[in-house]
């Protein structure tokens, strides 16, 4: 029984900070299964239905909803109540005619932003790296564990617009000075600003970015910057009406 608990459940006080749960109500909570997002960067699908949307009173009701294929993540029906849902995933529930994009609030917690139908056909994915594979082709290594073969036109840090569920590239946003960046970590999390300068280091230290916002400028790590557009964001963000 102890082993089962360690695999499928997690003590609430050990739950990642981004989980929207009360850690003192009960001892255990559901643990995410292996999937596209790491434990500390995701929440289980059951938590989305029960704790965030309130569509299920308990895990049993959430499992019934999922077993009926009533919930799609990035356009694919998901029945596993422990399936990990993370940043920029698109969650659709056709029976209630609602679609949401997973974002972060100003405390770093995962939240759902309801989106219009026209915005539900794509998701944004950041390029973490590039690999040359057999035949000289370029493989893009993306957030969420995805790898896709594409032209060598993209750079690490660029963000792709992927059609879902096909996962085909429809457009891209370059990680460059002048672009709009959403901050995904550090004390400025969830703030949006313009990239003023990208500072490349020639040592083991991380690259940094100087961001400009209406409130002023700040320096952040390059890995915390998720570009979301040029003149304006291509998606609705936290705080937008």
From Swiss-Prot:
Record keywords: Ribonucleoprotein, Ribosomal protein, RNA-binding, rRNA-binding
InterPro entries: Rib_uL2_dom2, Ribosomal_eS4, Ribosomal_eS4_central_region, Ribosomal_eS4_central_sf, Ribosomal_eS4_KOW, Ribosomal_eS4_N, Ribosomal_eS4_N_CS, S4_RNA-bd_sf
Pfam annotation, one family: RS4NT
GO biological process, one term: translation
Stored PROSITE patterns: RIBOSOMAL_S4E, S4
Gene Ontology cellular component list: cytosolic small ribosomal subunit
Gene3D superfamilies on file: 2.30.30.30, 2.40.50.740, RNA-binding S4 domain (3.10.290.10)
Recorded GO MF terms: rRNA binding; structural constituent of ribosome
Domain S4 RNA-binding: 43-105
Top-level taxon of the source organism: Archaea
Similarity remark: Belongs to the eukaryotic ribosomal protein eS4 family.
Name under which the protein is recorded: Small ribosomal subunit protein eS4
């Amino acid at each position: 029984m102890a082993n089962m608990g360690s695999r499928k459940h997690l003590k609430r006080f050990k739950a990642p900070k981004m989980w929207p749960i009360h850690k003192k109500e009960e001892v255990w909570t559901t643990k995410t299964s292996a999937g596209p997002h790491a434990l500390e960067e995701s929440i289980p699908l059951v938590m989305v239905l029960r704790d965030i949307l309130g569509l299920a009173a308990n895990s049993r009701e959430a499992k019934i909803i999922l077993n009926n294929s009533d919930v799609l993540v990035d356009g694919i029906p998901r029945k596993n109540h422990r399936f990990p849902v993370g940043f920029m995933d698109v969650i659709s529930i056709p029976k209630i005619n609602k679609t949401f994009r997973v974002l972060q609030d100003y405390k770093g917690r995962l939240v759902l932003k309801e989106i219009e139908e026209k915005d539900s056909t794509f998701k944004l994915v950041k390029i973490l790296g590039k690999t040359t594979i057999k035949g000289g082709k370029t493989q893009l290594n993306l957030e969420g564990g995805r790898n896709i073969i594409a032209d060598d036109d993209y750079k690490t840090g660029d963000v792709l617009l992927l059609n879902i569920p096909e996962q085909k590239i429809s457009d891209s946003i370059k990680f460059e000075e002048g672009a709009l960046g959403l901050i995904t970590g550090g004390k400025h999390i969830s703030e949006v600003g313009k990239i003023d300068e990208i500072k490349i280091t020639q040592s083991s230290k991380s690259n940094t970015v100087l961001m400009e916002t209406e409130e002023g400028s700040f320096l952040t790590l390059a890995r915390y910057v998720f570009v979301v557009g040029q003149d304006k964001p291509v998606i609705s963000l936290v705080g937008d009406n």
